[in-house]
Amino acid sequence: MIKTLSNIFKQDKEKFVIPRSVQQVIPIETIWSDGIFKIGRNKFTRTYKFTDINYAVASKVDKETMFLEYMDLLNSFDCGGTTKITINNRRLNKVDFEKAILIPMQEDGLDLYRKEYNNMLLDKATSSNSMVQEKYVTVSCYKKTIEEARTYFARVTTELNSHFARLGSKCAEVNGEDKLRILHDFYRTGEESGFHFDIQESMRKGHSFKDYICPDTFEFEKDYFRMGDRYGRVLFLREYASYIKDDMIAELTNMNRNLMLSIDVIPVPTDEAVQEVEKRLLGVETNITNWQRRQNANNNFSAVIPYDLEQQRKESKEFMDDLTTRDQRMMFGVLTMVHTAESKKQLDADTETLLTIGRKKLCQFSVLKFQQMDGLNTALPIGHRKIPAVRTLTSESVAVLMPFRVQEIMDAGGIYCGENAISHNLIMCNKEKLLNPNSFLLGVPGSGKSFNAKMQIVFLALATQDDILICDPEREYASLVEAMGGEVVRIAAGSRDHINAMDMVDGYGDGGDPVIEKSQFILSLFEQLDKKGINAKERSIIDRCVGEVYEEYQHGGAVPTLRVLREKFLEQEEPEAQDLALVSELFTNGSLDAFAHESNVDVNNRIMVYDILDLGKQLKTMGLLVITDAMLNRVTENWKQGKRTHIFLDEFHVVFENEYSGAFFNSAWRRFRKRNAFPTAITQNVEYLLDSVLASTMISNSEYIVMLNQAEPDRAKLATLLNISTEQMGYITNADAGCGLVKYGSSLVPFANRFPTNTRLYKLMTTKPGEDSINRGRM
């Protein structure tokens, strides 16, 4: 036997003690709060949790890259210990799940909509498999003291973080309480919310930590066990196929059942492995030589070497090539799996399903006989390996047992954004957890952009007290906002609602001189007035006059408006100033004076929609700029009060028609983030945006991007900008309404978002022709 394996078997060997209590079944001796467990004589373990990556929807090239990176991770495992990779399938606790996602009633006249929204969420949660898949790496080592173990695990932590980061996954240490919670949730399924453990309190009272996690009873039979009122069974992989597909683990763990699958890996030093293979190869060559000698003695000089001896020679040489030329490592592996059910009948049916999946992959799984307790302790992420059925493998062979499948997004306190198109689990996004909350909604007309935005608005209106501000160029949001108790501000030539383009609250700008910031904004407005734009002289005049208007206001002058600014132009001597006064006359004293009056809009309502449908083409871009500036003022006021603001800007591409308005929006985008505002830009003209360097930078720097069905040129540009694979592009090619891809931080997840059509909320949110009678009634 190889020295490494012999040593590990010797170190793992323990005196068998018949357990006299359920606590004694749990093979843990000592725990520390940082997550290190002592599970045997000088044997310490530590568990790490890692996140999933999009392996199932990756392109062939990307899959190969991920496979090689995962193989590098396996090769990095230390020979001095053993490593266990565990996939934990657990069903979400119904009570905790509902408490986390449902909106509480508030008796404010909107509970009717809350009930509809909650019913939709419950229907989605019931139809999905409600399973959470968690993935762990448990590293074991043999050290004399806890200090030595801590030093060892510190080095392992650094290596694991580095390798998982290259895979696109995140790896984090599991502390003592969380590791006990994993075991508690397995041992006491259905009682997840009842877990409470404080190590200091437990030590003070002299209680064993096992009392907090163990089930009420354990009964081990020949080929199954009972754990409390649940049944369980442990299987192991007895026979491996010659070629295993990389989706076998994904299929085994795709069952809608509580189960844990563990792969134990024992790496062997390369020099030992080469020595062992040379010894085996020498033995095969000796057998072939002896066989040939016997044939020659019988005067049979042309005999062909028997097939089995030829195969042994070929396989030994291939193994040697793997070790010496292909940077493979020899590893010993064992795959175990424990699954539980509510009845023996259900358990038997689930076992047969798992055995069938194995047979389909040409692998043979077997039930452990009279070893169910040892198998259970091997399958759990504790660090034990009590099943000796190890198989000799290479790094490549172990890497085929790929634990990755698809990324899930299920943040506490998140907004429902649809269902994962692959796993069918709910997608719950909490933008607070992202590096920045900036969002984009992109898609062709009819793909479901407005509906997606309205779903977010509904949740925010019903579940939070945050302010919601919407810029509505197509009058699509008014009926919904009024139903939610909000206010509609109609901005148009001749309208009674006015927004002063020169309003400026205390704290306006990026922290510099607010008058200079406002002057830049006024310059961007004047760029809209003439297709030729404004020249350097005119910019100087505008800058000077804006400064004078605000200076006079501080000394008791008139409230700054565009009319006051025009009068200031008329006072100047330069002919360019007179030209500016003439150009601005239409927008200050003429028929397009919507932004030249003092503001008379009530800003106390927390939900406001700015309806700019009737502004006309000449004022549309100016309207977007002025409303965004007004939103900035509101955001600044809310920020001072510690209040969050959500902003929705439709037809976003319009503002990038010239350099100044684009620069203003880029600046506003940064200020929103700094002042606790969550902006969302909505547009159908993706190609137009991506042609602007500023806009494409804004998109690439945004952490939350919803991509619905895209036109061909838009798809290609988005794929380049956001590194989307060909397979993932399929989810935004000829996609149904409400279906696509969501980029959430570093995750890229395909989703489907379908809302029940027989609800009041659907009628308020839809813009589909024939179903939008409420919105058409406002036109």
Predicted feature locations:
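Hydrophobic anchor at the beta1->P-loop junction of P-loop NTPases
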Residues: 441
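Conserved lysine of the Walker
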Residues: 449
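Hydrophobic positions on the alpha1 helix immediately C-terminal to the Walker A/P-loop
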Residues: 452
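A short helix-turn-beta junction within AAA+ P-loop NTPase domains corresponding to the substrate/partner-engaging
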Residues: 485-489, 694-707
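Extended, folded cores of ATP/NTP-driven motor/assembly subunits in large transport
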Residues: 1-404
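Conserved P-loop NTPase
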Residues: 722-778
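Post-Walker A helix-loop "phosphate-sensing" segment adjacent to the P-loop in P-loop NTPases
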Residues: 459-469
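P-loop NTPase motor domains
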Residues: 53, 60-79, 90, 253, ...
